[in-house]
Amino acid sequence: MLLPDLHPYTILLSIFLVLVAKQLVATIGKSTIQEFVWLVYLKVSSNQSIKTYNSKQHELHETNRQKRAISAQDEYAKWTKLNRQADKLSAELQKLNQEIQQQKSSIDKASNALILVLTTLPIWIARVFYRKTHLFYIRQGIFPKYVEWVLALPFLPNGAVGLTIWMFAVNSVVSNFSFLVSFPFAKRVSKPVRDTKVE
């Protein structure tokens, strides 16, 4: 076997944590997580183009403030010089913005790949390598035979519970819990109004 022979409770707990993480990602949203990762990258990065962009943006703001403070008719030469400087800064900012957007795109791809590796890959690995592992047993006679048979699907003897049923149960519980927690914060839906017929 390629993977180590894990204790059933280790598999139970690992799959539970992965499914909770997957539900958290679904509830929060990948785009929100990617935006958070990008903001963290902006804070900790020593990337020169980001620093240059911020300084040029501040410089453009100052130039525009000075330009608004003077009259174009009274001080035409100074206003024209400031206007040219603002146009030059805007062009530089646009170029830097394109570079930063490319960096953001690569950071988004990397964070998306990390989310995929952390939430989907472990589930597929477990499904392939631990599908025949008995996670726990149910006392005989608690459920009818057909329920025991369903719980043992797809590869286990009656009375055993495997990974497929465990994942189904955990997904159901976690998604229902997530709904109960997020429901009070959901956008309120207005009460429908009946169309009245005009005679």
From Swiss-Prot:
Keywords, sorted A to Z: Coiled coil, Endoplasmic reticulum, ER-Golgi transport, Golgi apparatus, Membrane, Transmembrane, Transmembrane helix, Transport
GO molecular function: protein-membrane adaptor activity
Organism: Candida albicans (strain SC5314 / ATCC MYA-2876) (Yeast)
Annotated membrane topology: Multi-pass membrane protein
GO cellular component terms listed in the entry, alphabetical order: endoplasmic reticulum membrane; GET complex; Golgi membrane
Membrane-traversing stretches: 12-31, 116-136, 161-177
Location (main, coarse): endoplasmic reticulum
Protein name: Golgi to ER traffic protein 1
Function: Required for the post-translational delivery of tail-anchored (TA) proteins to the endoplasmic reticulum. Together with GET2, acts as a membrane receptor for soluble GET3, which recognizes and selectively binds the transmembrane domain of TA proteins in the cytosol. The GET complex cooperates with the HDEL receptor ERD2 to mediate the ATP-dependent retrieval of resident ER proteins that contain a C-terminal H-D-E-L retention signal from the Golgi to the ER.
One Pfam family of this chain: CHD5
Family (UniProt): Belongs to the WRB/GET1 family.
Assembly notes: Component of the Golgi to ER traffic (GET) complex, which is composed of GET1, GET2 and GET3. Within the complex, GET1 and GET2 form a heterotetramer which is stabilized by phosphatidylinositol binding and which binds to the GET3 homodimer.
Alphabetical list of InterPro entries matching this protein: Get1 (IPR028945), Get1_fungi (IPR027538), Helix_hairpin_bin_sf (IPR029012)
Lumenal side: 1-11, 137-160
One Gene Ontology biological process: tail-anchored membrane protein insertion into ER membrane
Side Cytoplasmic, residues: 32-115, 178-199
Annotated compartments: Endoplasmic reticulum membrane; Golgi apparatus membrane
